[in-house]
Structure formats: structure tokens, C-alpha cells
């Protein structure tokens, strides 16, 4: 992807809807902030019909649907996605992450690596699904989709 396209179509801000967020631990809040920072550092985000960015994104959950409010120069749209196709992936991702964090404390490096590979594989699968679900609405690269999936999970974290 050309650097020019990456500069023209990028997110400049990301906000998670406060009403969609549950109270979480300090570690989970830090993970949210890191995910947003990483997303803003490097992303490709090209809404269909928008000439150029940068864009502001607000993410939230409404009636078990993902709501993406996107604003940019001459562009303002709300995209709503059903989360049903993601339910199993989100559940499995949380389970493998919990196992991974427990393994860090008690397991061998080989066991930790195996769990980490599984976690990354699930993350990739969910990211590819997100790209498919956004087709015709918003184009992203895989890394941007991965970071967006992390934030979708952040909206589902419960304390």
C-alpha cells in the first residue's frame, strides 16, 4: 500500500463510548490505552465514499451491535455491524487470553509460546472476519483490523 494512501486515509483519534464500557481493572484500562495508541501510530482506514482523512472514530455497543461513528473532512457516517459472527471468536479469545496470563505465572516457555500462537491465530481470524464485515463500508489493512478487534474486545471486557 502506497505511503500516500496511508497518509490520506488514517485515523487521527479513537474514542470508546463510555456508556459501552464496564468498570475494569487498571491493567485492562492500560491495555485499552495501549491498543488505541498503537492504532493511532500506524493505521490504514479508508471509509467508502470519503476522499481523504484524517478521520475520528467513536466505537460503542448498542443493543449488542458494534457502532462505528466516523467523521472526517466532508464525511460523517455511522456504521452498525452485528456482532453475532464474532461471538464465538470473542469468547474463545478471552478464554485463551486468560489461560495465557495464567501460564505466564506457572508454565514452561514452550507452553506459553503454544498459547501465544493460538491467541495470535484467533486474533488473525477475527481480524480477517472484521475486514470482510466492513467490506463496502470501510477498508483497512490487517494490522488496523487487528487493533480494531482488540478494541471490540475491550468493549466486552467485564471486571
UniProtKB/Swiss-Prot annotation:
Q: Which cysteines are joined by disulfide bonds?
A: none
What family is this protein classified in? Belongs to the UPF0262 family.
User: What's the protein name?
Assistant: UPF0262 protein PHZ_c2197
Organism per entry = Phenylobacterium zucineum (strain HLK1)
What does the organism's lineage look like at the top?
Answer: Bacteria, Pseudomonadati, Pseudomonadota, Alphaproteobacteria, Caulobacterales
Amino acid at each position: 500500500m502506497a505511503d500516500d494512501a496511508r497518509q490520506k486515509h488514517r485515523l487521527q483519534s479513537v474514542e470508546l463510548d463510555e456508556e459501552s464500557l464496564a468498570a475494569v481493572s487498571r491493567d485492562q484500562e492500560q491495555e485499552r490505552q495501549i491498543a488505541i495508541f498503537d492504532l493511532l501510530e500506524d493505521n490504514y482506514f479508508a471509509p467508502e465514499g470519503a476522499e481523504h482523512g484524517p478521520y475520528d472514530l467513536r466505537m460503542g455497543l448498542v443493543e449488542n451491535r458494534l457502532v462505528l461513528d466516523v467523521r472526517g473532512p466532508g464525511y460523517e457516517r455511522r456504521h452498525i455491524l452485528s456482532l453475532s459472527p464474532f461471538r464465538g471468536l470473542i469468547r474463545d479469545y478471552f478464554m485463551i487470553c486468560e489461560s495465557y496470563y495464567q501460564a505466564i505465572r506457572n508454565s514452561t516457555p514452550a507452553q506459553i509460546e503454544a498459547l501465544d500462537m493460538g491467541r495470535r491465530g484467533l486474533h488473525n481470524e477475527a481480524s480477517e472476519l472484521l475486514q470482510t464485515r466492513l467490506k463496502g463500508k470501510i477498508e483497512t489493512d490487517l494490522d488496523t483490523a487487528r487493533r480494531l478487534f482488540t478494541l471490540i474486545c475491550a468493549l466486552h471486557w467485564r471486571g
